[in-house]
From Swiss-Prot:
Organism: Bos taurus
Record lineage: Eukaryota, Metazoa, Chordata, Craniata, Vertebrata
Pfam families xrefs: I-set (PF07679), LRR_8 (PF13855)
Spans of repeat LRR: 51-72, 75-96, 99-122, 123-144, 147-168
Name of the protein in its database record: Immunoglobulin superfamily containing leucine-rich repeat protein
Gene3D superfamilies linked: Immunoglobulins (2.60.40.10), Ribonuclease Inhibitor (3.80.10.10)
All copies of domain Ig-like, residue ranges: 232-343
Gene assigned in the entry: ISLR
All copies of domain LRRNT, residue ranges: 19-50
Keyword annotations from UniProtKB, A to Z: Disulfide bond, Glycoprotein, Immunoglobulin domain, Leucine-rich repeat, Repeat, Secreted, Signal
Recorded GO CC terms: extracellular region
Glycosylation sites: 51, 309
């Protein structure tokens, strides 16, 4: 018995000797505890014994948590960091703590948080992040926290929540999320429905209120009236040349993205050409086709002209403009996308066959396209191909500018029969 006591004393002395200044280390109820609270620390100390299971750094002056801050203590089960001055938690600061069960980051100034670190904390049961400056939580932030029972997010600056944020938390029994400045728009409607039907305890619901829009300020979320909301939908139409039409230099291709949704979706164009990828947040030009103030362009008329009504014009369409044109619409409820492949071919040179081979991204699945009466007939929903034929009979001619009165075809651009260059612009 005396030998056992001596062994325990040696272990405790060794633990105490390994404890960094000015912390105190010891064992209590089978837990190896390192107490560094109220020490005016401005950085996480180093030199902890590897078997520490509880670490308290509360009530210090820590400004941030750098990557690898707790690499020395991989067996931590409880980490207390409340009442510091932490503004940022870097990627890798917490990722090594796979055995962590309790994490308290409350009463700090955190606005920059490495949410991906939570993916490694599958044993976590308590997460306190209340009283910080958080403005956003990624949809997949809690995807690995299936053991989490209590989550505190109250008194932050959260304006909205992505639908499904709490779905992975199958063990959750307590959620505190009051006193956040929620925008009571379509993006928050799902949370109202979830909060009214879930078995999770959500205290202080009288303080889960709207901050905006102004007419709803102060309204309790659980009393919010139904809102007219719908996810985006898109329909992409185009006005290419008729098969065999004679094209002159300066040909303009017109695409139109018809967008629907509530709230009104934001339109974005994604263009993949042989020269690279082009991203355009619509619009980038005014009604006259000239670049809007603040838009970076090589000239006053951008190569790709995105108008506010959903039309996209490509002046001087040529081989460099071949590729895939996609319009994407996004609002608070989701996104939708539609694409079309556009290519040039020269009659008599096997152009159609070559283009067919070029855009067989789904050929292995039996999804190909063919043209009938100048309309694309896709046999698969993803693959639309517009084939534009160039004439070899004429020499180069000067391209006309794209200006003109809507409803009248600018001269010298394209022989389209009854088709009008500004068909799309004039229709809206």
């Amino acid at each position: 018995m005396q030998e056992l006591r001596l062994l325990c004393l040696v272990v405790l002395v060794g633990l105490a000797q390994a404890c960094p200044e000015p912390c105190e280390c010891g064992e209590k109820y089978g837990f190896h505890i390192a107490d560094c609270a109220y020490r005016d620390l401005q950085a996480v100390p180093s030199g902890f014994p590897a078997n520490v299971t509880t670490l308290s750094l509360s009530a210090n002056q820590l400004p941030s948590l750098p990557g690898g801050a707790f690499r020395e203590v991989p067996r931590l089960q409880s980490l207390w960091l409340a009442h510091n001055e932490i503004r940022s938690v870097a990627a890798g600061a917490l990722a090594s703590l796979s055995q962590l069960k309790s994490l308290d980051l409350s009463h700090n100034l955190i606005s920059d948080f490495a949410w991906s670190d939570l993916h490694s904390l599958s044993a976590l049961q308590l997460l306190k992040m209340d009283s910080n400056e958080l403005t956003f939580i990624p949809r997949d932030a809690f995807r690995s926290l299936r053991a989490l029972r209590s989550l505190q997010l109250n008194h932050n600056r959260l304006h909205t929540l992505a639908e499904g944020t709490f779905a992975p938390l199958t063990a959750l029994s307590h959620l505190q999320i009051n006193d956040n400045p929620f925008d009571c728009t379509c993006g928050i409607v799902w949370f109202k429905t979830w909060a009214l039907t879930t078995a999770v305890s959500i205290p202080e619901q009288d303080n889960i209120t709207c901050t905006s829009p102004h007419v709803l300020k102060g309204t309790r979320l659980n009393r919010l009236l139904p809102l007219p909301c719908s996810a985006p939908s898109v329909q992409l139409t185009y006005q290419p040349s008729q098969d065999g039409a004679e094209l002159r230099p300066g040909f303009v291709l017109a695409l139109h993205c018809d967008v629907d949704g509530q709230p009104a979706p934001q339109l974005h164009w994604h263009i993949q050409t042989p020269g690279g990828t082009v991203e355009i947040t619509s619009p980038n030009v005014g009604a006259d086709g000239r670049a809007l103030p603040g838009v970076l362009a090589a000239s006053s008329r951008p190569r790709f002209q995105a108008f506010a009504n959903g039309s996209l014009l490509i002046p001087d369409f040529g081989k460099l403009e071949e590729g895939t044109y996609s319009c994407l619409a996004t609002n608070e409820l989701g996104s939708a996308e539609s694409s079309v492949n556009v290519a040039l071919a020269t009659p008599g040179e096997g152009g159609e066959d070559a283009l067919g081979r070029r855009f067989q991204g789904k050929a292995a699945e039996g999804k190909v396209c063919y043209t009938v009466d100048n309309e694309v007939q896709p046999s698969g929903p993803e693959d639309n191909v517009v084939i534009i034929y160039l004439s070899r009979a004429r020499g180069p001619e000067a391209a006309a500018t794209a200006e003109g009165v809507p409803g009248k075809q600018p001269p010298g651009l394209l022989l389209l029969g009854q088709s009008l260059l500004f068909l799309f612009l004039a229709s809206f």
